[in-house]
Amino acid sequence: MFLRSIFQTLCAVSFLAGSVFADSGVSIVSTPATTTVYLVRTVDCSSSEVTSQPVVTVYNVLKPDTVTFTVTETAGSYAKRSIEIDSDSVSPTSATTTTPVASATDVSVYSASIHVPTGNPPVDTHNPLSYDTEVTATTTFSIALPKFNKGDRVSSANTYSVSFVA
C-alpha cells in the first residue's frame, strides 16, 4: 500500500514536470523585428482625396502577409473609389493590379499586390481599386505587402482598425 502511494506520487510529479518542460518555448509570441507604417487614403475617380473617409494606417508588416482593412461608404460621397498607399519604402516597378473577388455577403472584396524594386526609392503610389463598380456597402480590401525595412509615414487622426492575416 505504501509503495503504491509512493509510485502514484512519482507518476503525478513526472507527468506535471513533463507537461511543464516538454513545451517550453513552443508558444512564445515573437516581437516584431521591423515596423513598417503605411498611410492609406481613399480617393475618388479624379484622384482627389475623399475627406469624409477616415485615414487607414497599417503597422508591423513583417513578411509577405495580407493586410486586411475596411473602408465604409458614407452618404453624399463619391461612389467610385480607389485606394492610395503612401510610404517612403513603396515604389512598384510594375503596374499595381486589383482583382475583384466574389464575397458570400454580397460585398465586393478586392486584392492588390505591391511590387517593390531594389533600393526602395521614395515614391507615392496610387492603387486604383475600381472605377466601374459603385461601392455602396462596407468593402474589404486585401493588400499583399512585401517585407520592408522602414516606413516613416504616420496618419494624423481617424484611423480604422487593421487586422493582419498571414
Swiss-Prot record:
GO cellular component annotations of the record: cytoplasm; endoplasmic reticulum
Signal peptide (from-to): 1-22
Keyword terms, alphabetized: Endoplasmic reticulum, Signal
Subcellular location: Endoplasmic reticulum
Protein name: Protein adg1
Species: Schizosaccharomyces pombe (strain 972 / ATCC 24843) (Fission yeast)
Gene of this entry: adg1
